[in-house]
Amino acid sequence: MSRRTDIESALRRLAPRIPDHEFGAVLDHALDSRGLRQAAPEEAAWLSLVAYVRHVFTDYDGLRDQDFDEDSARFFVAEEIEAVLTGWGVRRRLATED
């Protein structure tokens, strides 16, 4: 199987109810991110999913623009991220480093 197929499968398992247009954006991020090229497909799918939700569905970037450090900004948006992920059928929970 190709890396694309492996990540697609991992993402479908992680987020079975993710809308198709969001699925494509998360998949593209997982495939295009230099930092994820060596990651296992499951890890690439998870990290891309969390990053996508953080930047698209929360005020994370606004908090960073207000000089919140990365950890603080992530803390303040964690519940919003969890809500979106839960809506997409994700059972995995955020870890402190996510």
Predicted regions and their residues:
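Structure-specific DNA junction-binding interface
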Residues: 1-98
